[in-house]
Amino acid sequence: GFSIEKKKGFGQKRERLWGVMTAKRNKETLRQVKDVVVVGAGLAGANVAYQLAQAGVRVRVVDEAVVPGAGASALCWGILHPHYSRDDNLLSRLSREGFLATRSLIDILEAKTGKTLFSPTGCLQMAHSDDIYKSWCDARGKNLPFALPATYAELLDAKSAGLAAGLELRRGGWLFHKAGMVRAGAFCRTLMEVAAVPYRGNTSVVAVQKTQAGWLLRGAMGEVIDEAEDVVICAANHSAQLAHSPHLGLEPLPGRITLLRDIDLEGLKMPVSGEGYITRMDDGYVSVGATYELPATEPWEETAAHEDNLQKLSSLLIEPTDVVVTGSYQGVRAAGLGRLPAVGPACNEAAWLEAHKAQPSRFDFSGMEQKGLWVCAGLGSRGLSFSARSAEILVSLMTTASVPADKSLLQALSPERGVRAYARRLEV
């Protein structure tokens, strides 16, 4: 950070601002990142690799899938939209900033490749309840959290929202004009292609081992897959193990999307998001979702998943409608603490817990990172709106560039917050 003060100006200026850098600079912050391996080629890994390549860093990617954009990132079409909250909490801020970052990045990729990665349908975020809608109306009247440009979002009543979406909706909500649908898997592959990042697929990394020079990636037979001074873990639910961070706080959230016929909900013009969501994909099929099949429950039967999704569909519409289930899509998300991803240097949790044991009243220990080991994981259900922004932040931290985020957001995303939460639970 900088210490800013006013001083006497020069020329025709009465005053000028004078800044002195007060942030401590050490060998680690001045260390130049030159050679990086990214583990994982989903939305997180592909975006991190792209940003590193743009920064001039030599980077390559390893993943267990044959091609980038597999696993939970393999959606043919996913919804890209911000979320509104009247208090503009951290989740809403990251969602908005990430939405804009992803839209901008997709525009660049489409211009360079001629591919169609985005369908500009708009998106309607319907209020979950009448009370929430009233709260939104009150907030809009008071310009909370700030005045939103009409070109970005409009708050519509139920009738107007229904006309915009093409269906009779149960209540009103925010219409985000620049939202739409993204070819998620193709987005990942295009990032890698445009950045010319080498990809080693069909390769499972089971361990990341510290060496004097950096880190070794090992496979199931103990073989060395690769080595680099810096490694970024973007391996979804495998990230905690690979980052030596058992308290990273990622939770596996299996989920299923119900697919309907192309003739169902024929009037639907854009995605509608509320307790659940409905959308029409470019191939015509309608999708309804999605389930959150918590690990604490028994594995769900397919019929139970469809029933849950159709219940979500009913919560969005005024009148029930006849639809026919044709199939499903399923995947396992990795959700971070507080529904926020883990982005930053991997924490040396053993050293952190030792320091906390010596000073039980302290929860803010600096210098507890694992040098050269980084994490970007836990995007949850918001991979499209979180990934580009998270990658920007991480690569700025890695390259010691000016970090495009304030301190509160960096702390909220820090991988250290998992072990901090664990230590606090021990005190209860």
Describe each PLM feature range:
Residues 28-44:
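Beta1/beta-strand and adjacent pyrophosphate-binding region of the FAD-binding site
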Residues 17-33:
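A short, basic/flexible loop-to-alpha-helix module at the beginning of a structural domain
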Residues 86-87, 115-125, 149-194, 291-296, ...:
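Helix-loop-beta segment of a Rossmann-like dinucleotide-binding subdomain
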Residues 93-98, 130-132, 174-190, 300-305, ...:
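Short beta-strand to alpha-helix junction loop
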Residues 1, 174-221, 225-226, 230, ...:
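Helical element adjacent to the flavin cofactor pocket in flavoenzyme catalytic cores
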Residues 77-163:
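Dinucleotide-binding Rossmann-like beta1-alpha1 core, especially the glycine-rich loop
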Residues 37, 44-55, 64, 72-73, ...:
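Active-site substrate-recognition segment that forms the wall
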Residues 323-428:
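C-terminal catalytic lobe of FAD-dependent flavoproteins
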